[in-house]
Amino acid sequence: LNVFCAGSVAARAAAFKHPAMAYDISYCFQVMMQCINDPDFIQALRIFERKHCREFEEQEENKLIYTTIHNEYMQLIEMWIEGRMTQAIPGFNMETFLPELNEFIQSGAAERGDAKKVVDLLNSWADFPSFKEQMLDASKLVFFAIE
């Protein structure tokens, strides 16, 4: 993980905090974008895909193992994002943040800029059919030794 300069991050987080919310959602989205664009995060996802992609087959029926692998994938993503948020935002707590994030998304405010990019990516990762297609694509790359 790339480590943020703790002093400047803490000052920015405190300066932008909305009084009605525990966290400044706009700043949180910036931190999530930094995580999502982090080469180490991208590498971790690629390693996961290469490790598990051979389990996936192009067929309508889904094996039970697919659900297990998808859950592990989501845990990996959540671990990275929560780790980055904890580094960047003093006192960050995911259980406090998630209801605020949901409220922000439901308000329609997440339809702009980085917020939209982050929400779209999170939704695509959580969507099982998209995940399965991604794993099938990774399997083809591994099979043909393209990567």
Model-derived segments and spans:
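Low-complexity, disordered terminal segments
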Residues: 1-2
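Phospho-regulated, Ser/Thr/Pro-rich intrinsically disordered or coiled-coil terminal scaffolds
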Residues: 5-83, 88-96, 102-105
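Alpha-helical bundle protein-protein interaction modules that mediate dimerization/oligomerization
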Residues: 81-84, 88-147
